[in-house]
Amino acid sequence: EDDIEADHVGFYGISVYQSPGDIGQYTFEFDGDEWFYVDLDKKETVWRLPEFGQLTSFDPQGGLQEIATGKHNLGILTKRSNFTPATNEAPQATVFPKSPVLLGQPNTLICFVDNIFPPVINITWLRNSKSVTDGVYETSFLVNRDHSFHKLSYLTFIPSDDDIYDCKVEHWGLEEPVLKHWEPEIPAPMSELTETVVCALGLSVGLVGIVVGTIFIIQGLRSGGTSRHPGPL
């Protein structure tokens, strides 16, 4: 089939999976960016940014009904077909700051978790080994081309050389929780020996410059003196 070219693309739909507990979601994406999803537990629409909810609205009951219908149909199809349960994949996590880090300046840490399947996961933030809940936001499960998922968790924070952070990932595909560590990279202060060496090198370069400059001046004076001697008549 030929790909359809368009200036903008909106995508909405449900994802349901047979697994212990409720696994399913209803999402809406526009040009590849998530606008909202329906929270199954709270039964409410969760907007990716508060401003999106001011532009339009969505009744979460519509999404919940579609998820319920999808689960019902999935159960029927499962009973009528021979199927092999999908294996649990081990997710991969990466932590990085949203902006260049400056101590004392507000910033956001991003924990990007990829290769998630099935879409059931716990992502938590730790600061100095203690759980952090304030300033935390995460997306719904976003679909990859291979039908696995990825998810992003955000933590707003103020960088300090006293704090270290970890993104903790728990998933059925992992034998134990994975911690992805992050701390601000602060240049180490120079030791006294290093400072002495740097000063000595700077002094040496300066002396060499003075000597070379003096030589050029002397040569210039000699050349000038020679040119002033009168030639033969």
From Swiss-Prot:
Query: Where is this protein found?
Result: Membrane
Cytoplasmic-side stretches of the chain, per the record, are 222-233
Question: SUPFAM superfamilies recorded for this chain?
Answer: Immunoglobulin, MHC antigen-recognition domain
Residues annotated as domain Ig-like C1-type: 91-183
List the residue ranges of the region (Alpha-2). Answer: 89-182
Q: Per UniProt, what is one GO molecular function of this protein?
A: peptide antigen binding
Q: Does the keyword Membrane apply?
A: yes
Which Gene3D superfamilies does UniProt cross-reference here? Class II Histocompatibility Antigen, M Beta Chain, Chain B, domain 1 (3.10.320.10), Immunoglobulins (2.60.40.10)
Keywords tagged on the record: Adaptive immunity, Disulfide bond, Glycoprotein, Immunity, Membrane, MHC II, Transmembrane, Transmembrane helix
**GO CC entries:** external side of plasma membrane; lysosome; MHC class II protein complex; plasma membrane
Q: What InterPro entries does the annotation carry?
A: Ig-like_dom (IPR007110), Ig-like_dom_sf (IPR036179), Ig-like_fold (IPR013783), Ig/MHC_CS (IPR003006), Ig_C1-set (IPR003597), MHC/Immunoglobulin (IPR050160), MHC_I/II-like_Ag-recog (IPR011162), MHC_II_a/b_N (IPR014745)
What is this entry's stated membrane topology? Single-pass type I membrane protein
Query: Which GO terms fall under biological process for this protein?
Result: adaptive immune response; antigen processing and presentation; antigen processing and presentation of exogenous peptide antigen via MHC class II; antigen processing and presentation of peptide antigen; positive regulation of T cell differentiation
Superkingdom field: Eukaryota
> Into which family does the record put it?
Belongs to the MHC class II family.
Q: What is this protein called?
A: H-2 class II histocompatibility antigen, A-F alpha chain
The record lists the organism as: Mus musculus (Mouse)
Q: Taxonomically, what lineage is the organism? A: Eukaryota, Metazoa, Chordata, Craniata, Vertebrata
